[in-house]
C-alpha cells in the first residue's frame, strides 16, 4: 500500500517537473488532467486562508483505489485564496490533497525533520498526526455536484 501511495506522489511530482521543464518561462496550464475524465459531476474547490498570494496551488484528486489519480491541477493564487472547478468526474469516493508551492519549485518544501514549510491540506480537513493524514479519513462520497471549501494547515 505504501508503494502505491509513493508511486502516486512520484507520478504527480514527475508530471509537474515535466510541465515546468518544457514550459521554460511559459505559464503552466490552469488545469492538467492525468487521466481522461468522462463523468457528469462537477467538483468546485475553494482553498482559503493562504499565507501569501505568491506561487501556485497544486491539487491532487485520487480515487478510492489509491493507484489511479483522477486529476491534478496547478492553480494561481488570487488574493489569499484559490478556486478551481473539475468537470466530468464519475460518481465515487475520492480524496483531495493540496499544497501551496509558494516558491514554485515543484515540490512541498520540508524542514530538516520532515515537517512541511509550505501550507498543505486535505479533504475532510484531516489533520496529520505523527505523519501524513490517513488516506481513508480523507475519502468522501461524490454523488452530485459539490462545492468544497478547504483551509490549509500552516
Predicted feature locations:
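Short beta-strand and strand-turn-strand segments in soluble, beta-rich domains
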Residues: 66-72, 130-133
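Primarily secretory-pathway and cell-envelope proteins
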Residues: 20-57, 61, 110-154
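Bacterial Sec-dependent N-terminal signal peptides
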Residues: 1-27
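Acidic, glycine-anchored loop motifs typical of Ca2+
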Residues: 102-110
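Short beta-strand segments within Ig-like beta-sandwich modules, predominantly Fibronectin type-III
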Residues: 73-78
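A short tyrosine-centered beta-strand micro-motif
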Residues: 94-98
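A glycine-anchored, Pro-Gly-centered beta-turn/N-cap motif
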Residues: 80, 85, 89-93
Amino acid at each position: 500500500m505504501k508503494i502505491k501511495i509513493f508511486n502516486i506522489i512520484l507520478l504527480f511530482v514527475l508530471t509537474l517537473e515535466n510541465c515546468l521543464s518544457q514550459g521554460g518561462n511559459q505559464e503552466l496550464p490552469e488545469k492538467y488532467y492525468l487521466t481522461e475524465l468522462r463523468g457528469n459531476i462537477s467538483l468546485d474547490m475553494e482553498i482559503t486562508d493562504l499565507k501569501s498570494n505568491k506561487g501556485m496551488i497544486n491539487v491532487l484528486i485520487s480515487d478510492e483505489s489509491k493507484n489511479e489519480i483522477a486529476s491534478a491541477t496547478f492553480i494561481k493564487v488570487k488574493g489569499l485564496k484559490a478556486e478551481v472547478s473539475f468537470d466530468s468526474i464519475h460518481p465515487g469516493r475520492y480524496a483531495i490533497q493540496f499544497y501551496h508551492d509558494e516558491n514554485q519549485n515543484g515540490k512541498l518544501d520540508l524542514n530538516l525533520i520532515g515537517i512541511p514549510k509550505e501550507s498543505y491540506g486535505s479533504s475532510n480537513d484531516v489533520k496529520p498526526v505523527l505523519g501524513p493524514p490517513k488516506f481513508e479519513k480523507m475519502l468522501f462520497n461524490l454523488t452530485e455536484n459539490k462545492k468544497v471549501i478547504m483551509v490549509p494547515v500552516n
